[in-house]
A protein has these predicted regions:
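Fe(II)/2-oxoglutarate oxygenase catalytic core
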Residues: 1-94, 100-126
Length: 126
């Protein structure tokens, strides 16, 4: 029930805020279903890999698919400082950000966190 509104969200967010030249979402090659159980976390990383001739990821979009509440598991973005995105813990919520932004998922302290990740690609940045 969330996937089509999520795709609309991705397209609208890119058009209104980022303006990146993207390949059609119908050519998506990578969706990732993430399951974070109690005690798991994902350390700091970026999704875009500089100077990679194959990957041209520009935007990362995440959709929270959890149907039950969980504790911990905050998404944290790092630009000039850490930004904790606790609003993303609400089921059905979505977030989109440039794939070159460093981010992590804090440790789940109870419950299970389920998300869908879409990486949107386009021609290389100039």
């Amino acid at each position: 029930k969330y996937i089509f509104p999520f795709i609309d969200f991705c397209l609208t967010a890119n058009n209104n805020y980022f303006g990146f030249d993207l390949h059609s979402l119908t050519s998506l090659k990578k969706l990732n279903y993430n399951i974070y159980d109690e005690g798991t976390e994902y350390n700091w990383h970026i999704d875009a890999v500089p100077r990679d001739p194959v990957r041209d990821i520009k935007l990362t979009a995440l959709l929270n698919l959890s149907e039950e509440t969980y504790e911990g598991g905050d998404l944290v973005l790092f630009r000039a400082n850490e930004i904790i995105c606790s609003e993303f813990n609400t089921p059905g919520s979505a977030i989109i950000f440039p794939s070159y932004i460093n981010h992590k998922v804090n440790k789940i302290t109870s419950g299970k966190r389920l998300t869908l990740a879409i990486w949107m690609s386009g021609p290389k940045f100039r």
